[in-house]
C-alpha cells in the first residue's frame, strides 16, 4: 500500500527523520533523540507536522443548529468569533466516532479539525446527518487528498512549549494579534509572504503554544522560518509521551466507537444537563458511567506500562489503554479503564510479562505547563 504524505514529507526526510506508517500516513516518529525532542517542548519550543489531520469547514445558515445535534458538547458555548470547543462526536449508541475541535467564526461558518485516521468516515457521517436532517450545510474538507479541486488546501503545524508563542511572533510578526488570545481561541491573520494563517491557542502537549492552519503550498516555508527562529522539529514519539503526561486521550487507543465518553474520562465534554438533544444522548443517559478512567504510576522496577496490560484492583480487573515511560517524571505512567469505584491513591497490580508489579492510581494529568502534578 502506498502511504500518504504531508506537504512536509521531503523536509522530514532531509532532516533524517525516522519515518513510520501512522494510520496510512508516512510520518516522522523522531529526528534523532525522542527524549530531547520531548524535553525541548517542555523547556523551550518544538514543532510538529500534524497536516495528516483534517480541517473540515461547515457553512450555511443552519450550521449552528446542525452542530447542536451532531456534537456531545454544547456548541452554544461558542459566541465569540475564534472561540474553540473540544467535543466528541457520537453514534446513536453513545460510542465515540471521533474527538475533535470546532471553531466558531460566524453564525454561518464553523471549522472542525478531526483526526487523520477517522477523517473519511467522519465526513461521510457528517454528510449523512446533514442529509437526514435537511440542514443544507456545505461540508468542505481542506486536507490535500480530500479537498475539492476548486478549494485551497490546508496544512497544520503545532508549535508548542513555554517559548513557542514568542518564537512564532519572531518568525511571523503578522501573527502578533494572537498575543491577546486566551486558550482555546483563534484568530485569522494575513501574512504578506505566507498568506492567510489561522493561529489557534490550542495543542496536544500540556504546554502553551499555537496550532497554525496554513496554506499547504506555503507550509514548507513556514516550517523553515520557525526552524530559523529556534523551534525544534519533533516527531510522533515525543507527541505521544507529551500528550500522555498531559492526560490527553488518543482516539483509537483510549476510546473508540465501542467506548462511551463517560468511561474515557471525557464526561466534562458531554452536555447532559441542558434540554438540547444530540446523537447518543439517550444512550448515555440510559447507561451512565460504568468505568473510571484514571492515571497509573508504576512503583515497582522491572517493567514499562503499556496498552492492553491487565490491571488487578480491589474491585475487579481493569485494562491499560495507553502507557509509556515519562521523560519528565522518570517513571512509567499509563491511562487505565478501571472499575468505577476505584479512587486515586489506590494501589493496584499490573500484569507485565507474567509478573505482577505494583502501581498507584492517580488523578490525571501527570504534568501540565512543565510542572509535575503527581509524585
Curated annotation (Swiss-Prot):
E.C. number: 2.1.2.10
The main enzyme category here is transferase
The protein's GO terms of the molecular function aspect are: aminomethyltransferase activity; transaminase activity
Q: InterPro entries recorded for this chain?
A: GCS_T, GCS_T_bac, GCST_C, GCV_T_N, GcvT/YgfZ/DmdA, GcvT/YgfZ_C, TrmE/GcvT_dom1
Naming one, the record's GO cellular component terms include: glycine cleavage complex
Oligomeric form and interacting partners: The glycine cleavage system is composed of four proteins: P, T, L and H.
UniProt lists the family membership as follows: Belongs to the GcvT family.
Q: What is this protein called?
A: Aminomethyltransferase
Q: Which organism is it from?
A: Cupriavidus metallidurans (strain ATCC 43123 / DSM 2839 / NBRC 102507 / CH34)
Question: What gene is behind this protein?
Answer: gcvT
